[in-house]
Regions:
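Mature catalytic core of soluble alpha/beta enzymes
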Residues: 1-172
Length: 172
């Protein structure tokens, strides 16, 4: 988990993602960084851009606006329009030994990072022979049912339980 945080965290100083956002290029990215960003770009492509890992500039524009003027309502359209110019997943380049983003871009993998980490932990446990496991790192992923054969019951605090017998559930 620490290794994955060192690659994907938006909040950890020195993470690969933070270094990429600062320098606009990341040389020799880890396999995890490459796989997670490749997955993010695949989802962006399949969703027609509805999911976009380059959304961080737009997020930061909102955060900065509300921090400076908490009671002023929504940011003006010109603030949003300027931030939106940075949001375009098609400008992200994953090369043979580097990742590059536009000078105005900043990435976030928050939309898939927690699930990616949960899946990697579950994969590792499965490869080590575990057949009846529920991994819960904020996102849930099961490897098979309980030993009894019953499904794992997972739910949000206000929801009806959902049965997992070898699958995943993510909520926000």
């Amino acid at each position: 988990i620490e290794r994955l945080e060192d690659a994907l965290s938006l909040f950890r100083d020195g993470s690969e993602l933070r270094r990429l956002n600062r320098a606009k290029v990341l040389h020799s990215p880890s396999g995890d960084m490459r796989r997670a960003l490749t997955l993010a770009l695949d989802i962006a492509s399949r969703s027609g851009g509805l999911f976009d890992p380059s959304v961080q500039a737009l997020w930061e524009a909102h955060v900065d606006w509300f921090a400076a003027a908490p009671n002023a309502g929504l940011p003006p359209e010109e603030v949003i329009a300027k931030a939106r110019t940075a949001v375009d997943w098609r400008r992200i380049r994953i090369g043979h030994d580097s990742i590059r983003i536009g000078e105005d871009q900043r990435l976030s993998l928050n939309g898939l990072g927690q699930g990616y980490v949960t899946d990697r932990v579950a994969d590792l446990l499965y490869l080590r022979g575990f057949k009846h496991v529920l991994v819960d790192l904020g996102e849930q992923r099961s490897i098979g049912p309980r030993r009894s054969g019953a499904p794992w019951l997972v739910a949000r605090a206000d929801a009806v339980p959902f049965a997992l017998r070898g699958g995943a559930l993510a909520t926000s």
